[in-house]
Structure formats: C-alpha cells, structure tokens
C-alpha cells in the first residue's frame, strides 16, 4: 500500500470515529432544505405543554385566584419582578412577555430532559432529547437575545445608539462590536453544555447502577436545569437593560 493510500485510510478512520462521536440526526427534507426534525419535534411538544398549562390555568379566572390560577399569577409575578430588576422600572413592561417566554421555554425544556425518557421513542436515525440539549436551539435563543438587545437600544436611542461602540476610544470599536455578539453566545454554550452534561451523567449512572444512585443525580439535574433557565433569562434581561442605558 502506498504512502498516499495509507494517509487516505487514516483520514477515513478519523472521519468514521467523528461520525460515531457526533451521532446521527433525523432530518425532514423540505424542498432543497434539510430540517433538523429531532429538535422541532421536542420543541413543539414543549410549546404544546406550555400552551395547555396556560389554557387550563386561565379558562375560569376568578377575582380571588385559587389553584392553577394562583400558581400562574405567582409565576408571572416572579417573571415581572425579574424583568423589572434587570431592565428598570420605566422600561421593563414591554419586555415581560419576551423574558417570560424565554424563561418558561428553557425551564420546561430542561425539565423535560431530566424527567421525560425521550430516548424510548425510536426514530429512523438518531434519538430524541430535550430541545436545549441541542446546540441549534441554544444558539437560536442567543440570536433572539441579540436581536432584542439591538432593537431595544435602537428603539430607545435611535442612531446615537451606535456611538457607544467608539467609547471611550474608537480603537475599541472591533472589541465593542465583538462583545455584543459573544455575550449572548456565551449564554447559549453554557446552557447547552450544562444540559448535555446532566443528561449524559444520568444516562451513564443508570446504565451502571440502574436503581438507587441515579435518583439523587436526577434531583440535582432538576435543580441545575431551573438555575440555568433563571441565569439565561436574567442575563438576557440585563443585556437588554444595558443596551437602553448605554453603559457597560
């Protein structure tokens, strides 16, 4: 076998190994586009859960809240207080739906990965997992945060918003621009890494000791999942508030 053939064989082996590590995915073909079906399926399920809970809790509203209505009002009050704390008393109200949607979607997605056995459902390729277990979802959430960040600043300050990029000196222009994109992206990688690591640890422990040991880790995963949703929503609100205030 020639030296070139050996090198080609080596590269093929590395390629096969990378395929095993990355895993397989299930796609839908829509025209010339491939849609990542695994993420869409689980995301739609999470959205359906949120909509169902909202309808059930608010279909019979009372002046004095009880039961599900009381719980929903508590959650909304928590989200409102979080948004007001980070954005400010004068500007927070229009951003409560955005921050609330972000928090609830991430929270339910994270908990679905910790509580629901997605992998029992077989697909032609790949396997189901929590939406936030996929980097595509977390990066999409980061991009939404970036769009909200720029919109808030432009809506509040107009074109003068871009003046912050040359403060305190124009030399920092590239760094200031890069910072606005890296902050939301750091959120996405943190969320993705924590949720993926939690599911992998629980899966490994269940395969080794299937009865007792994984239970504490599952409770720890639930706690971590809630904290990650809170961190993402809090920092997203803080970035939006920062863009309207115009300081770093």
Swiss-Prot record:
<dbReference type="InterPro" id="IPR023011">
    <property type="entry name" value="ATP_synth_F0_asu_AS"/>
</dbReference>
<keyword id="KW-0375">Hydrogen ion transport</keyword>
<dbReference type="GO" id="GO:0009535">
    <property type="term" value="C:chloroplast thylakoid membrane"/>
</dbReference>
<keyword id="KW-0793">Thylakoid</keyword>
<dbReference type="GO" id="GO:0046933">
    <property type="term" value="F:proton-transporting ATP synthase activity, rotational mechanism"/>
</dbReference>
<keyword id="KW-0813">Transport</keyword>
<dbReference type="InterPro" id="IPR000568">
    <property type="entry name" value="ATP_synth_F0_asu"/>
</dbReference>
<dbReference type="InterPro" id="IPR045082">
    <property type="entry name" value="ATP_syn_F0_a_bact/chloroplast"/>
</dbReference>
<keyword id="KW-0472">Membrane</keyword>
<feature type="transmembrane region" description="Helical">
    <location>
        <begin position="135"/>
        <end position="155"/>
    </location>
</feature>
<comment type="subunit">
    <text>F-type ATPases have 2 components, CF(1) - the catalytic core - and CF(0) - the membrane proton channel. CF(1) has five subunits: alpha(3), beta(3), gamma(1), delta(1), epsilon(1). CF(0) has four main subunits: a, b, b' and c.</text>
</comment>
<feature type="transmembrane region" description="Helical">
    <location>
        <begin position="37"/>
        <end position="57"/>
    </location>
</feature>
<comment type="similarity">
    <text>Belongs to the ATPase A chain family.</text>
</comment>
<feature type="transmembrane region" description="Helical">
    <location>
        <begin position="221"/>
        <end position="241"/>
    </location>
</feature>
<comment type="function">
    <text>Key component of the proton channel; it plays a direct role in the translocation of protons across the membrane.</text>
</comment>
<keyword id="KW-0138">CF(0)</keyword>
<keyword id="KW-0812">Transmembrane</keyword>
<feature type="transmembrane region" description="Helical">
    <location>
        <begin position="200"/>
        <end position="220"/>
    </location>
</feature>
<feature type="transmembrane region" description="Helical">
    <location>
        <begin position="96"/>
        <end position="116"/>
    </location>
</feature>
<keyword id="KW-0406">Ion transport</keyword>
<keyword id="KW-1133">Transmembrane helix</keyword>
<protein>
    <recommendedName>
        <fullName>ATP synthase subunit a, chloroplastic</fullName>
    </recommendedName>
</protein>
<keyword id="KW-0066">ATP synthesis</keyword>
<dbReference type="InterPro" id="IPR035908">
    <property type="entry name" value="F0_ATP_A_sf"/>
</dbReference>
<dbReference type="Pfam" id="PF00119">
    <property type="entry name" value="ATP-synt_A"/>
</dbReference>
<dbReference type="GO" id="GO:0005886">
    <property type="term" value="C:plasma membrane"/>
</dbReference>
<keyword id="KW-0150">Chloroplast</keyword>
<keyword id="KW-0934">Plastid</keyword>
<dbReference type="GO" id="GO:0045259">
    <property type="term" value="C:proton-transporting ATP synthase complex"/>
</dbReference>
């Amino acid at each position: 076998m020639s030296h070139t053939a050996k090198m080609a064989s080596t590269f093929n082996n590395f390629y096969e190994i990378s395929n095993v590590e990355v895993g397989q995915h299930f796609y839908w073909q829509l025209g010339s586009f491939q849609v990542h079906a695994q993420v869409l399926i689980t995301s739609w399920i999470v959205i359906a859960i949120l909509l169902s809970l909202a309808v059930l809790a608010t279909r019979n509203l009372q002046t004095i809240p009880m039961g599900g209505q009381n719980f929903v009002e508590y959650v909304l009050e928590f989200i409102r207080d979080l948004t007001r704390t980070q954005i400010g008393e004068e500007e927070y109200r229009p951003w409560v739906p955005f921050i609330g949607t972000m928090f609830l979607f991430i929270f339910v997605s994270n908990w679905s990965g910790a509580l629901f056995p997605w992998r029992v459902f077989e697909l032609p390729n790949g396997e189901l997992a929590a939406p936030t277990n996929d980097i595509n979802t977390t990066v999409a959430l980061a991009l939404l945060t970036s769009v909200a960040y720029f919109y808030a600043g432009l809506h509040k300050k107009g074109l003068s918003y871009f003046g912050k990029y040359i403060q305190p000196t124009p030399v920092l222009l590239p760094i200031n621009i890069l910072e606005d994109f890296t902050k939301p992206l750091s959120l996405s990688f943190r969320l993705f890494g924590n949720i993926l690591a939690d599911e992998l640890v629980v899966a490994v422990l269940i395969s080794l000791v299937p009865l007792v040991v994984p239970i504490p880790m599952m409770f720890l995963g639930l706690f971590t999942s809630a904290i990650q949703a809170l961190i993402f929503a809090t920092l997203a609100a803080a970035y939006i508030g920062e863009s309207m205030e115009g300081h770093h």
